[in-house]
């Protein structure tokens, strides 16, 4: 873990910090973790905290402590009609940060209880997280996607590169 977090460029590392940040299209929240990953939240309520954490050593099982910065989207327990939107940039370079505006790098195609569909404009990758059987609108690759399916595809030259999986572990309860 890391003991600091950047909130819109400002480094925070005071133990006991607790902040609630509302995010919107016009006022997105930008967070950077200690590993250089950036999180852009443009819909939702973001909570940030820096606390001392107690745990056990992985091998010795002796008590250990450390300072950890955490952030999460607070959407409540089983929200009705809840909504949030965020994007993660994995360790972007300085050039990428200067060249691209985060909100212009992706487009949400669908975001509802049936499916989340997002187009990564920079790479041309289309991604789907399907929760219920659905017929994607305005898609020339799929006419139907079954529930519990994750799909990503990218057109390369005259080929279609695709990754498909089910997040269901099929473990009987």
Describe the predicted segments one by one.
Residues 71-77, 150-151:
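Beta-strand-rich interaction surfaces with strong enrichment in secreted/lumenal proteins
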């Amino acid at each position: 873990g890391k003991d600091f977090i950047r909130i819109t460029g400002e480094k925070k590392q005071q133990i006991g910090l607790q902040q609630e940040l509302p995010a919107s299209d016009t006022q997105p929240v930008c967070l950077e973790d200690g590993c250089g990953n950036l999180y852009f939240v443009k819909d939702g309520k973001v909570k940030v905290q820096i606390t001392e954490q107690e745990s056990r050593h992985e091998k010795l099982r002796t008590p250990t402590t450390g300072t950890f910065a955490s952030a999460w989207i607070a959407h409540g327990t089983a929200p009705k009609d809840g909504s949030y939107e965020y994007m993660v940039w994995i360790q972007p370079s300085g050039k990428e940060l200067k060249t691209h505006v985060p909100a212009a790098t992706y487009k949400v195609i669908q975001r509802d209880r049936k499916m989340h569909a997002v187009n990564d404009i920079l790479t041309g990758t289309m991604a789907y997280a399907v929760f219920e059987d659905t017929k994607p609108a305005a898609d020339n690759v799929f006419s139907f996607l079954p529930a519990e399916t994750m799909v990503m595809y990218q057109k390369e030259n005259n080929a279609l590169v695709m990754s498909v999986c089910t997040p269901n572990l099929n473990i009987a309860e």
